[in-house]
Amino acid sequence: MVTTALNTTKSEEIFSAAQKLMPGGVSSPVRAFKSVGGQPIVFDRVKGSRVWDVDGNEYIDYVGTWGPAICGHANDEVNAALRETLEKGTSFGAPCLKENILAEMVINAVPSIEMVRFVNSGTEACMSVLRLMRAFTGREKIIKFEGCYHGHADMFLVQAGSGVATLGLPDSPGVPKTTTAATLTAPYNDLEAVKKLFAENPGEIAGVILEPVVGNSGFVLPDAGFLEGLREITKEHDALLVFDEVMTGFRISYGGAQEKFGVTPDLTTLGKVIGGGLPVGAYGGRKDIMSMVAPAGPMYQAGTLSGNPLAMTAGIKTLELLQRPGMYGQLETITKKLIDGLLSIAREAGHEVTGGNISGMFGMFFTGEPVRNYEDAKKSDLHKFSRYHRGMLEQGIYLAPSQFEAGFTSLAHTDEDIEKTLAAAKVVLNNL
């Protein structure tokens, strides 16, 4: 059973059958609930801030399909736009006007992006941007940070976060050593470690890629001066700075983390929010760099479904909604109320916790020590988190089934949702 209080018979039956059809019974590892125990619930439908499972149980959702549902699930305006586009076709395999519209919106919003290429996922965006980094600089080595996740491509599965961290894996079998030999790693928030890597590899490093706000080791903020320091170091060594804003883009501010912190990278990857719930990714940056991408330049990258009209439509409408006055203030207010309440309740119940938020992105660790990087995140009491997760599920609150994933609010969450969540947390944390 997933819980003791909920009837999840149908979820169990479906998941049992799924395990005979798909590896682990899921299409993405974290969904299997391995780090929190029990079997996953199977969703039937979603709307606004709520999700319903196949047994009819209703939950307040703080996963938001892992970030894209910033306007709430099945937003009426997004759905209406999709229905209109659907009548014209789902995929053209040729240019469409909606690509221009979304591209212009992205370019106008994100400080670093002068040109953009649409792809089908965040993983694809990061794979492509790595190839571009190497093509532009003529160098092969890159620096990534421990616990930062940039998708499941071979060259990034070194000290990765997200599902890799959830399963307790340092990397993955099947990745050739030669593929990751050029991937250097440093602890997040450690500028001295980055300087050391540049000193040890003079003229060989193409650039640095990172999540400007980490969401795949749990929620970890950059120290004051960290992003600025990376910008200075990369400029000093004629290397590129790349922000993986698949998670933070259009979520923590309309212009992403780079707008929020005032640090402009050379290249940026995007996903999640810009697809409005449909599969999408993008990478973009300075025009002189992006001009190397085929067919304008020699660096090849392509995709059958890239820029398809449905994904473009959902992205356009989502960004239009986010442009309305007060949207990000609303996200900040409601998310701060949530995380401040959770931390207060946990501490009053005698638990050592730390956490925070930035706009509609938040996290809480079961440790009293500050969390500045992946090693700090691993000090969280994972057994306690798993019991907390199961308890909240019983109370009708759906949280990410991993300590190493950030949580998300949406514009559909209400004060009543937050109050119900905090009331549930009080019950769970006082009995943990």
Curated annotation (Swiss-Prot):
* Family matches, as SUPFAM superfamilies: PLP-dependent transferases (SSF53383)
Q: Which GO terms describe its cellular component?
A: cytoplasm
What domain of life is recorded for the organism?
Bacteria
As for family, the record states: Belongs to the class-III pyridoxal-phosphate-dependent aminotransferase family. HemL subfamily.
The record's listing under PROSITE patterns reads:
AA_TRANSFER_CLASS_3
**What are the cysteine partners in each disulfide bond?**
none
What is this protein identified as?
Answer: Glutamate-1-semialdehyde 2,1-aminomutase
User: Which cofactors is this protein said to need?
Assistant: pyridoxal 5'-phosphate
- Organism annotation: Picosynechococcus sp. (strain ATCC 27264 / PCC 7002 / PR-6)
Which InterPro entries did the record assign? 4pyrrol_synth_GluAld_NH2Trfase, Aminotrans_3, Aminotrans_3_PPA_site, PyrdxlP-dep_Trfase, PyrdxlP-dep_Trfase_major, PyrdxlP-dep_Trfase_small
Key words, A-Z: Chlorophyll biosynthesis, Cytoplasm, Isomerase, Porphyrin biosynthesis, Pyridoxal phosphate
Q: Where in the cell is it found?
A: Cytoplasm
